Structures are given as structure tokens and as C-alpha cells.
């Protein structure tokens, strides 16, 4: 056996040992490591609300979900996008960039309806959701989520389209920032203006 072969065998063994010792023993941490960098929406009403600057595709955090309608065929979702006021959802050729499991919402036709709230201080609770959940007691929705950008979405059940709650991501034109050159506030993807904010 040559010196190179012995050196390679020793280094491979050391690398394997270091990798084994540094890998997380907690299965939750292992899953967290595997999904790091992927856009997966969360479902946690205690999650921090992100600040979004410039143009970014981000997952929503579903903070409210309830079924209603005939035979509970409608799934109503409220997904927080970020702290407002944002400029809105980015459009290409007049189509909002909203994805459900990496497909544009338009591929689902009438099974999807939504309203985007940009996070103004005067926005009101979604009237369709308030009406759909009226009479549900503590589960009824009436929160306007002021100063929080969010999306209200209704998904109509179709077993050929949905195998579960879809992963929802949106392409957002982020927070409005002050342009110190003109003393105006508006959307900008200029990194210097975003950093100044």
C-alpha cells in the first residue's frame, strides 16, 4: 500500500468522524438543516413578522385556517407576508405572482380566490372571511391585522387538485422607503435606500 493510499484512508476516516460528531442528534434540528434555504410556509401565530425590502419571493406564515361553506368545501386561510406597508404583490403581464406548490395560482382557476392587504394602518378585516366565519364563536375572524401585510385566500376543495394545504409563496414589492434625494416615500429596490431605512 502506497503512502497516498494510507493518507487518503486516514483523511476519509477523520472526515467521517468529524461529520458524525457535528451532525445534530435532535431529529427536529436535522430536518431544520435539510430544509434550510427552502421556501416553506409556516403555520405559527407566534412567528416573528419579517421586514421585506426590494423585490423578494417569500413564503407566507399561515396564522388562521378554517373550513366553511357547503360540506366544508372551502378552506379559508390568512397568511402573513410581512410588516407593512408594502408596495404590493409583483405582477408580470397583469398577473400577481402568487404560487401554490410552485404553480401560479391561475393554474387552479376558480378553485382559488384571494385578497392582498398591504399593511396600511387603516385596513379593515376581510368582509368575505368575516361573513364565512360568522357564528363560529371564538373561531370567528374579525382582525384587520393593521400594519401587517397579509393575504386572505379561499381554496375550494377538489381532490384532483389538492392533496393537502399548499405551500404558498408570493413575490413581494417590499416596504416603502424614504428616498433622501427627493424626500418622498415609496417602493424601491435600491439597496442604499433600503439599508438607510
Regions found by a protein language model. Give the residues of each.
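Polar, S/T/G-rich
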Residues: 2-197
Amino acid at each position: 500500500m502506497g503512502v497516498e493510499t494510507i493518507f487518503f484512508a486516514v483523511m476519509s476516516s477523520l472526515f467521517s468522524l468529524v461529520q458524525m460528531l457535528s451532525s445534530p442528534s435532535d431529529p427536529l434540528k436535522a430536518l431544520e438543516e435539510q430544509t434550510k434555504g427552502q421556501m416553506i410556509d409556516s403555520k405559527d401565530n407566534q412567528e416573528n413578522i419579517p421586514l421585506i425590502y426590494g423585490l423578494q419571493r417569500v413564503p407566507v406564515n399561515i396564522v388562521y385556517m378554517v373550513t366553511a361553506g357547503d360540506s366544508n368545501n372551502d378552506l379559508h386561510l390568512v397568511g402573513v407576508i410581512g410588516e407593512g406597508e408594502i408596495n404590493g404583490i409583483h405582477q408580470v403581464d397583469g398577473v400577481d405572482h402568487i404560487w401554490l406548490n410552485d404553480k401560479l395560482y391561475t393554474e387552479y382557476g376558480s378553485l382559488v380566490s384571494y385578497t392582498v392587504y398591504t399593511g396600511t394602518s387603516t385596513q379593515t378585516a376581510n368582509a368575505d372571511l368575516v361573513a364565512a366565519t360568522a357564528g363560529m364563536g371564538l373561531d370567528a375572524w374579525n382582525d384587520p391585522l393593521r400594519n401587517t401585510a397579509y393575504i386572505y385566500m379561499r381554496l375550494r376543495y377538489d381532490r384532483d387538485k389538492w392533496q393537502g394545504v399548499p405551500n404558498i409563496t408570493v413575490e413581494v414589492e417590499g416596504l416603502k422607503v424614504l428616498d433622501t434625494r427627493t424626500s418622498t416615500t415609496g417602493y424601491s429596490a435600491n439597496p442604499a435606500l433600503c439599508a438607510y431605512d
